[in-house]
């Protein structure tokens, strides 16, 4: 029988730890918790997808904006395809200015729910599916929290996160959110600071979304 020295035991122990660590990284990735939806550094944008994706878009939306609904209706599925392929990431910047115009709190509630959905357990595809579903159900009174939670579950958001949405748990201050993202929108699109605005973070230019092929051109 071979006698192992203290050095042999140490070497085998180190190799075992290395093998275990390598396997863990292969399965779970280098981070302690991989998240497909993250808050941006200023805390008011939501990065959906990988920060390493070659196409990085910043999209300014208002939950009650009909033109934003048109954008998601036309381009939501191609955006989802880009997210799934890893070629595209979207930083959503939600605004709530239409609450004052319509004398309601729909945009504030929906934006709060969308920030609640930005959880480490939420896949990018689930978040994008929720965005599209919310715009499909756009209405003057808006969905209530239970309705939003049901859409979240159907989109693939974890049940515990959907429960927080249903309860209306606080996730973001709507007024501060609108102020911060409004200032950012004025910065990137001073000539026409409306919603939706799509901004290319790679070229630092506003995207002409009136061109039907804008997304294909960016993704090619």
Show which residues each predicted segment covers.
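Alpha-helix capping and helix-coil boundary motifs
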Residues: 123, 142-147, 158, 210-214
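C-terminal cap of thioredoxin/glutaredoxin-like
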Residues: 153-220
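A short, hydrophobic/aromatic-rich structural module that often spans a beta strand
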Residues: 139-151, 169-172
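Structural alpha/beta surface segment adjacent to cysteine/selenocysteine redox centers
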Residues: 69-146
């Amino acid at each position: 029988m071979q006698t192992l020295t203290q050095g042999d035991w140490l070497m085998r122990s180190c190799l075992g730890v290395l093998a275990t660590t390598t396997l863990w990284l292969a399965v779970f990735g280098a981070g302690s918790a991989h998240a497909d939806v993250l808050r941006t550094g200023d805390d008011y944008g939501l990065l959906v997808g990988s920060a390493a994706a070659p196409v990085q878009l910043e999209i300014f939306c208002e939950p009650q904006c009909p033109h934003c609904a048109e954008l998601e209706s036309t381009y939501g599925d191609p955006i989802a395809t880009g997210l799934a392929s890893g070629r595209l990431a979207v930083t959503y910047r939600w605004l709530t200015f239409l609450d004052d115009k319509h004398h309601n709190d729909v945009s504030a509630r929906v934006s709060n729910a969308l920030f609640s959905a930005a959880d480490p357990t939420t896949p990018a595809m689930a978040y994008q599916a929720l965005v599209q579903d919310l715009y499909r159900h756009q209405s003057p009174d808006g969905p209530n929290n239970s309705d939003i939670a049901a859409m979240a579950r159907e989109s693939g958001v974890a049940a515990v996160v959907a429960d927080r949405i249903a309860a209306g748990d606080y996730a973001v201050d709507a007024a501060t959110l609108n102020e911060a993202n409004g200032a950012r929108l004025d910065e990137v699109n001073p000539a026409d600071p409306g919603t939706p605005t799509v901004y290319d973070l790679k070229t630092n230019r506003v995207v002409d979304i009136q061109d039907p092929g804008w997304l294909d051109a960016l993704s090619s």
